[in-house]
């Protein structure tokens, strides 16, 4: 069985292994390169076609973990290619007119002080669009899944191949809270400043055509956010996208706080699995 979905992901070492509590960082924020690769090993066990963006030094390690499965690894120097936008992010993060709007407890979240973190989080649609434009995607559907999405061994639920008949006329975002209603751009900014999370950034699914639409929308939303002297990770940007084009999206509820239940809720095209997903949806309030 061949999946209808290509998985795209990326990993770049932004120094997160040094974000330890004894250095003043928030508890449980530190993750070394080795930890990230241990998470990736679980995702990499899937036999779906995968396209992975990384730095030149990490390419052999990615290829070794995939071990002959259909894989394309693309190397890129993000520090060089995106140095201007990184500098702009950093300038806003250090601007008191931005930081004074944040609650003190939010100041330790990396989206408010790490330009590398914000940059990498905001490149997901860029990476997918680049892979599509390079002609690397051969399947109808494309899924972005974070390199470190599989924190625990059972996240993929023992699947060998991940496949689900997502509606190709929509982009599919995944939520951990019900009731997202956005009525103004200012409300989106309030969500960003207050760190209100509805949409996760760890998984996004769409057809190749819809990804191109989504990429343009992401770029527009990122520019608006920066021009208003605000920075945020992908979660806030995706809320902005939803506000601007609600017709483009399906919001798929994973369950309250269930960040890592993608493969449980959307695991095959069989009737039984669909019924299981429906039961999960109805039971999670």
Swiss-Prot record:
InterPro entries in the cross-refs: WlaTC/HtrL_glycosyltransf
Signal peptide: none
Signals that turn on the gene: Expressed in both exponential and stationary phases.
Disulfide bonds: none
NCBIfam families from the UniProt entry: HtrL_YibB (TIGR02192), PRK11346.1 (NF008462)
Protein name (Swiss-Prot/TrEMBL): Protein HtrL
Originating species: Escherichia coli (strain K12)
């Amino acid at each position: 069985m061949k999946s209808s979905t290509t998985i795209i992901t990326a990993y770049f070492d932004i120094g997160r292994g040094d974000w330890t509590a004894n250095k003043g960082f928030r508890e449980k924020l530190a993750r070394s390169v080795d930890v990230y690769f241990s998470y990736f090993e679980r995702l990499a066990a899937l036999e779906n076609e995968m396209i992975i963006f990384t730095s030149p030094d990490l390419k052999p390690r990615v290829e070794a973990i995939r071990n002959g499965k259909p894989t394309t690894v693309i190397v890129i120097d993000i520090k060089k290619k995106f140095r201007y936008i990184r500098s702009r992010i950093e300038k806003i993060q250090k601007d008191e007119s931005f930081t004074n709007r944040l609650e003190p407890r939010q100041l330790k979240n990396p989206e408010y002080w790490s330009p590398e973190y914000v940059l990498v989080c905001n490149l997901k649609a860029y990476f997918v669009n680049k892979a599509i434009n390079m002609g690397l995607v051969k399947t109808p559907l494309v899924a972005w899944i974070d390199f470190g999405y599989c924190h625990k061994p059972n996240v993929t639920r023992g699947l060998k191949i991940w496949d689900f008949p997502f509606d190709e006329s929509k982009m599919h975002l995944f939520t951990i809270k019900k009731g997202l209603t956005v009525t103004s751009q200012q409300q989106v900014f309030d969500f960003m400043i207050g760190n209100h999370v509805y949409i996760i950034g760890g998984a996004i699914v769409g057809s190749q055509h819809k990804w191109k639409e989504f990429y343009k929308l992401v770029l527009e939303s990122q520019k608006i956010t920066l021009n208003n002297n605000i920075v945020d990770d992908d979660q806030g940007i995706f809320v902005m996208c939803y506000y601007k084009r609600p017709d483009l999206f399906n919001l798929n509820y994973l369950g309250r706080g269930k960040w890592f239940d993608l493969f449980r809720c959307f695991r095959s095209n069989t009737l039984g699995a669909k019924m299981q997903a429906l039961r999960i949806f109805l039971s999670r309030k």
